[in-house]
Structures are given as structure tokens and as C-alpha cells.
């Protein structure tokens, strides 16, 4: 399944993306993020992470660097942990 999804992403990047132009507000681009997420996390979780990323990529988003979370991290708790550690004295 991973191979099929990555092949579809490669097709999009080579055939469709050049026609639309560069519109992604993030680094890496959404298609590169999706490929990395699928490679690191597998088809199911990688697709979920890619879908969340696509929902964040819109004209009102600030964009910036948004890397795929490491395979052993729980991305849902990461912002809360960072926020809690910044409030400690």
C-alpha cells in the first residue's frame, strides 16, 4: 500500500504540480511531507498526518517549517509538552 501511495504522490509531483505552480506555504512541500510521513509512519498514520497537514495549508496560514514528527513521538501531545515546559520557572 505504501508503494502505491508514494507512486501516486510522485505522479502528482511530476505531472500535476508543475501545472498548478508552487502554492504550498510550508517547508517541506505538502507532497514531500506526505511522502516522508508515509515512509516513516506507514500508510495509515502517514496518510492521516498528510491529511492534517493539507488542512493546515491554506491562504490564512502563516506557513513555515513543519517537519514530519519522528516515528516514536506522539504528535498530539507535543504542543502541550512544549507549552508546559515554557511555563516552568
From Swiss-Prot:
This protein's UniProt keywords: Cell inner membrane, Cell membrane, Membrane
Compositionally biased intervals (Basic and acidic residues): 77-89
Ranges for region Disordered: 68-89
Subcellular location, principal: membrane
Recorded topology in the membrane: Peripheral membrane protein
Classification via InterPro entries: Membr_insert_effic_factor_YidD
GO annotation, cellular component aspect: plasma membrane
Domain of life: Bacteria
SMART domains membership: Haemolytic
Localisation: Cell inner membrane
Record-linked HAMAP family: UPF0161_YidD
Similarity comment: family membership: Belongs to the UPF0161 family.
Summary of the function given for this chain in its UniProt record: Could be involved in insertion of integral membrane proteins into the membrane.
Name the record gives this protein: Putative membrane protein insertion efficiency factor
Organism the protein comes from: Burkholderia mallei (strain ATCC 23344)
